[in-house]
Amino acid sequence: MKRNFDSVKRLVIKIGTSSLVLPSGKINLEKIDQLAFVISSLHNKGIEVVLVSSGAMGFGLNVLDLETRPAEVGKQQAVSSVGQVAMMSLYSQVFSHYQTKVSQLLLTRDVVEYPESLANAINAFESLFELGVVPIVNENDAVSVDEMDHATKFGDNDRLSAIVAKVVGADLLIMLSDIDGLFDKNPNVYEDATLRSYVPEITEEILASAGAAGSKFGTGGMMSKIKSAQMVFENQSQMVLMNGENPRDILRVLEGAKIGTLFKQED
């Protein structure tokens, strides 16, 4: 299927913790700089971009020099609150190199479930777009409790990115991950696994091919990405799942390159 994203004027990009934090726990500064360059380039072309960024836990572990994610909910929230400050500080610094202004929006599930607070959130996004600001969104881990096993959480930032795409009326959601896209079976187990370039619907076969996942820094897996694609379909939008190793590939995707997996219902 030929890809054409010429009509995309509003875009949500989701980046996961594994793309921001190295296996050693150190912050991937080079990748963050590339991401800021790409988003700034799109912004300069008149495309409105929202960045949904995980990473608060990973940044917090780095700042506090902790090797493992705490088991206790309160400590998880504390580490995330420390990490969120560090992450936004770095984003603000890096984006400023490209003369791009950013803001922070921390959401909880109840914000989008109640009409009044949802309207306020929409107004905030629209006002930021009018001001030429790139909103950076994360879940408010310091006060949310259900991803951390307890119900004000979205579940993970894959789901959050799909919800944000709906809230802002995005033309496209690009989800950056540590895999190349959706395969017909687990590529870490089967050498003959084949990348699916195009998915027009979420079938039982596709659901069955989604395995478990998550790193010590993050929470998302393939199943959460499939469920996010289902939400995107329900909102009559589209999603690309691609490897976040080289953020500049986002520009190639928007030019029509067949990178990753395109989730798009047939016209």
UniProtKB/Swiss-Prot annotation:
CDD domains: AAK_G5K_ProB. HAMAP family: ProB. NCBIfam families: proB (TIGR01027). Coiled coil: none annotated. Pathway: Amino-acid biosynthesis; L-proline biosynthesis; L-glutamate 5-semialdehyde from L-glutamate: step 1/2. Pfam families: AA_kinase (PF00696). The keyword Phosphoprotein does not apply. It is found in: Cytoplasm. InterPro entries: AceGlu_kinase-like_sf (IPR036393), Asp/Glu/Uridylate_kinase (IPR001048), G5K_ProB (IPR041739), Glu/AcGlu_kinase (IPR001057), Glu_5kinase (IPR011529), Glu_5kinase/COase_Synthase (IPR005715), Glutamate_5-kinase_CS (IPR019797). Its EC number is 2.7.2.11. The keyword Cytoplasm applies. GO terms for cellular component: cytosol. ATP binds at K14, S177, D178, T219, G220, G221, M222, M223, S224, K225. Substrate binds at S54, D141, N157. One of its GO terms (biological process) is L-proline biosynthetic process. The gene is proB. Belongs to the glutamate 5-kinase family. One of its GO terms (molecular function) is ATP binding. It catalyses: L-glutamate + ATP = L-glutamyl 5-phosphate + ADP. Catalyzes the transfer of a phosphate group to glutamate to form L-glutamate 5-phosphate. This is Glutamate 5-kinase.
